[in-house]
Amino acid sequence: MQMGMAVLVLVIACGVLSVLFAIWAIRSVLAADQGTQRMQEIAEAIREGASAYLTRQYSTIAIVGIVVFLLAWYLLSLNAAMGFLIGAVLSGVTGFIGMHVSVRANVRTAQAASLSLAGGLELAFKSGAITGLLVAGLALLGVSVYYFVLTVWLGYAPADRTVIDSLVSLGFGASLISIFARLGGGIFTKGADVGGDLVGKVEAGIPEDDPRNPATIADNVGDNVGDCAGMAADLFETYAVTVVATMVLGAIFFHGSDALTNVMLYPLMICGACVITSIVGTFFVKLGVNGSIMGALYKGLIATGLLSIVGLGVANTLTVGWGEIGTVAGKSITGTNLFVCGLIGLIVTGLIVVITEYYTGTNKRPVNSIAQASVTGHGTNVIQGLAVSLESTALPAIVIVGGIISTYQLAGLFGTAIAVTAMLGIAGMIVALDAFGPVTDNAGGIAEMAGLDPEVRKATDALDAVGNTTKAVTKGYAIGSAGLGALVLFAAYSNDLAYFAANGQIYPYFADMGPVSFDLSNPYVVAGLIFGGLIPYLFGGMAMTAVGRAGGAVVQEVRRQFREKPGIMTGKERPDYARAVDLLTKAAIREMIIPSLLPVLAPIVVYFGVLLISGSKAAAFAALGASLLGVIINGLFVAISMTSGGGAWDNAKKSFEDGFTDADGVKHMKGSEAHKASVTGDTVGDPYKDTAGPAVNPAIKITNIVALLLLAVLAHMA
């Protein structure tokens, strides 16, 4: 136990170091030059809008959170309720601080880019690293410190149901914040983007981020609340939920074993080691002699990945060792095999990054095919974009299948869980790449609105083009890890269910229930699969509808301002930017509530609905389990299709900004008919990649978390 205590303290120290590094980076970013007075005024407007939105969003979520906290206390225990509170608060804090920094880094990045491309890259990436390392550090601290409190201060055994229920509740707290942040932020950002583009670019013929567009500040606010705060909450949740699910599986599989304590500390130690490798990896991001921005970012990612192999070895040595740990379902589990599973997780991450970049990167076949289709019109652009979005699901799915089968062969379901933990271990670096995107996007907007030299806009555009790809890449990573993480949660559900059923004398609700069969000949299983499969589609449809409504409101507002203030187009009158921001804030908060509750309530409806119809608890649990699989499988394909397809549409549009040469050798420039067709495609792709697709992510996991909590609640019933 002494060694276990030392490892736990070391894990907590790694989390603290990550937060300290983020604080140092914040001081460094805020010390940079803010540029001209005009630049600072624009940045202040973006900052005010983002803060107003996030404050209102979290105030709304807090009401839901208080109700859930009281329910968790009443139905489970105070410890479980506190776990929920820790997960929710830390998830919110991560997003808030990340956005707080990004809305201050944007103007500083624009100023740095006016001096050199390398300076702009360094500042934008450093601000992204702050969000990334806060996500990893606070998620690791949340789980490890609460586990320390439960097992050391309160004296519970590591596999005690109180510990497991409390940690699962922590994951639920993070999930609830995540789904609201992802969906609300996505509705805001894409409502502004779609509305601003349709009237500004297509109708008025003015460029992106033109200060004459009344929606331009709202668009820049949206980049921060969607891509920074939203992604931070999403990956915080995936990180926390995956670590918790792996610990729960460890507690189930190794219950009563001497290796139990070390097995439960193993995923925490992997994440602790990988936090350190992510910190070291940030120092490798430097612009090389070839001037490749993506190359500079990939240097950091590759360094983190290679160092993480060493980190995995350290985690093995300090916890489970290299020999045999125990036997699970007749399969011998060794430390060496678990180490290889961790390596497979890192390889899966690398492959998903490469595949996503191929489908969304400029000058790659998929993006060029959409740009080429734009030459023949709006309809062909949309058709080809949909074709690319569907095609983009195949390779990631094959990689994920390979990861599942290979890790299962090596170490069973616990091996798969360790692979996902290793994937999430490097989340600090991955989120840094993502949060880099909104900062560079905002920097370009500020440069345009402040009327800086065209060379500055050229530098920020180069950073922004890479930022678009990194945002797409990180979404691919987030979806892949979410799909695998949800599979681990499903394994926890099925094994938890088997545990309760086998111990009916302790848990009366499960006594005399009979065996639960997930056999496909069971009609309740098929019904559950179909019901679960519809959730990502219905959820995605609701999200797209919400963006359409918000975007429509922005279109009306921008048209109204152009109509009532004709001086806007000549520069004699100033647009009312705050009106569009306020309108979108209200719309996003209003539109996010019902879709967000769908994946939370669905498992409860499935269980009690089937129980009412069949009168059989076993049939109800089988239908619920099958519905979780339906959500995971369809959710994975819907999310990958939407995010990769949307990213490809976006970069196809960007191809025209520097001039796109078609198959016949004709060059099409910005403002051409082909460019207008590409803007239409991007208008469809925007809510695909930034609202519906990413929000399916937390929806997949929250259904599984709710199912786990439902088991815990039923187990507490007399």
From Swiss-Prot:
Residues at which Ca(2+) binds: 650, 682, 686
Signal sequence segment: none
Catalytic activity: diphosphate + H2O + H(+)(in) = 2 phosphate + 2 H(+)(out)
Enzyme Commission number: 7.1.3.1
Domain of life: Bacteria
UniProt binding sites for Mg(2+) 2: 220, 223, 441
Annotated positions binding Mg(2+) 1: 193, 197
Any one cellular-component term (Gene Ontology): plasma membrane
Binding-site list for substrate: 190, 689
Top enzyme class: translocase
Cellular location(s): Cell inner membrane
Membrane-spanning ranges: 6-26, 61-81, 83-103, 112-132, 133-153, 168-188, 235-255, 265-285, 300-320, 335-355, 385-405, 413-433, 472-492, 524-544, 593-613, 620-640, 695-715
GO molecular function: diphosphate hydrolysis-driven proton transmembrane transporter activity; inorganic diphosphate phosphatase activity; magnesium ion binding
Residues the record marks as site: Determinant of potassium independence: 471
Cofactor entry: Mg(2+)
InterPro entries: PPase-energised_H-pump
Membrane topology: Multi-pass membrane protein
Residues of the site described as Important for ion transport: 182, 227, 234, 690, 701
Keywords: Calcium, Cell inner membrane, Cell membrane, Hydrogen ion transport, Ion transport, Magnesium, Membrane, Metal-binding, Translocase, Transmembrane, Transmembrane helix, Transport
Family assignment from sequence similarity: Belongs to the H(+)-translocating pyrophosphatase (TC 3.A.10) family. K(+)-insensitive subfamily.
Function text: Proton pump that utilizes the energy of pyrophosphate hydrolysis as the driving force for proton movement across the membrane. Generates a proton motive force.
Subunit record text: Homodimer.
NCBIfam families membership: PRK00733.1-2 (NF001951), PRK00733.3-5 (NF001960), V_PPase (TIGR01104)
Name used for this protein in its record: K(+)-insensitive pyrophosphate-energized proton pump
Biological source species: Brucella suis biovar 1 (strain 1330)
